[in-house]
């Protein structure tokens, strides 16, 4: 537990003090956010607000995770390193995207194909990494089985190992792409993505720490409901560090935001959710835990699909939070209400995880 507390405090301290330093640097060099002309008109006043705040979130998380893991004697573990690779790798792609937007003063950053290629490369290396380097108990970071609160009977290796690995690569890429897009779309209002993420990673802190104390490697573990997740304590420390970094960043990102996380932060957060869902073997449960993110991305998919099919719009504007803006809701009202919904959903997801464990006792 001391490792989690240390990681949280260190990350929050680094983030809350490092963010204003980054703000001054970005303002000095006039690295501000470009605002789309076709968005809500009230967003035009945000033009020029410093972006790429995700840099501080990433750095604070990585440093605090390393210190927390060393304090707890939990790592750096192979699972933790894989999660950091996915987290930082997608953050770098986002940083390139943000940089191009700023330099060229347009809403389009990296070409979509370039961004997809980058995501595929990072996600594929992560996926392959989860299938190697078992620990002394024979536990791998990943599994070919589709998982809910633990691996299910449905496995991607049904037609042999070779095809199973190929399907696993595709499945992992789908998970990573879906979550990174979901968090990116949610990052549209001051403090929204950061606040929602705190609740999601709060739920995953509980899940990973519970997997630690109920690990099959623990003395006297019940084989009926213990967990074979590899390095759960290290993953819990990462979650605690990320929550601390987000809390510190939110101090400056709350409305009216003095800085945005940008694609740098949004893609990294999506990578963290995806990575945790795979490494904790909760791929489908993550849909519940991160249900607010899912609702936002579904609103965008529904809007586009219905408009292409019928020429009509379901929402006044997508993603979902912009719909409520055009209904006349204040930005702060939307953000706080979405936070409340995200908190309830995240707690429900953690509750489902615990209920599944209880059902096996």
Feature map (PLM): residue ranges:
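Juxtamembrane helix-capping/reentrant segments at transmembrane boundaries
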Residues: 36-50, 105-118, 326
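Short, amphipathic alpha-helical segments
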Residues: 83, 104-115, 138-140, 161-164
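Alpha-helical transmembrane segments
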Residues: 1-27, 57-95, 99, 126-147, ...
């Amino acid at each position: 537990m001391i490792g989690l507390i240390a990681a949280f405090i260190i990350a929050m301290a680094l983030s809350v003090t490092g963010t204003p330093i980054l703000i001054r640097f970005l303002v000095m060099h006039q690295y501000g956010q470009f605002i789309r002309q076709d968005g809500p008109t009230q967003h035009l006043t945000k033009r020029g607000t410093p972006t790429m705040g995700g840099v501080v979130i990433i750095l604070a998380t990585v440093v605090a995770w390393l210190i927390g893991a060393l304090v707890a004697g939990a790592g750096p573990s192979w699972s933790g390193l894989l999660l950091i690779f996915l987290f930082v790798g997608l953050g770098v792609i986002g940083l390139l995207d943000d940089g191009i937007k700023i330099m060229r003063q347009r809403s389009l950053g990296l070409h979509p194909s370039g961004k997809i290629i980058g995501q595929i490369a990072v996600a594929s290396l992560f996926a392959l990494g989860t299938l190697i380097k078992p620990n002394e108990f024979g536990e791998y970071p990943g599994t070919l089985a589709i998982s809910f609160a633990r691996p299910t009977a449905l496995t991607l290796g049904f037609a042999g190992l070779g095809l199973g690995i190929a399907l696993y690569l595709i499945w992992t890429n789908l998970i990573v792409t879906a979550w990174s897009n979901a968090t990116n779309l949610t990052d549209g209002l001051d403090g929204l993505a950061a606040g929602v993420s705190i609740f999601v990673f709060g739920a995953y802190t509980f899940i990973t720490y519970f997997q630690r104390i109920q690990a099959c490697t623990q003395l006297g573990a019940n084989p009926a409901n213990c967990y074979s997740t590899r390095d759960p304590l290290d993953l819990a420390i990462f979650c605690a560090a990320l929550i601390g970094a987000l809390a510190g960043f939110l101090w400056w990102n709350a409305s009216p935001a003095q800085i945005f996380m940008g694609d740098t932060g949004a893609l990294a957060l999506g990578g963290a959710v995806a990575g945790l869902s795979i490494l904790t073997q909760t791929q489908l449960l993550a849909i519940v835990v991160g249900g607010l993110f899912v609702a936002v991305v579904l609103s965008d998919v529904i809007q586009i699909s219905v408009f292409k099919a019928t020429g009509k719009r379901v929402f006044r504007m997508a993603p979902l939070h912009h719909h409520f803006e055009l209904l006349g809701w204040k930005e702060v009202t939307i953000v706080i209400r979405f936070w409340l919904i995200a908190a309830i959903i995240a707690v429900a997801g953690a509750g489902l995880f615990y209920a599944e464990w209880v059902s096996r006792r």
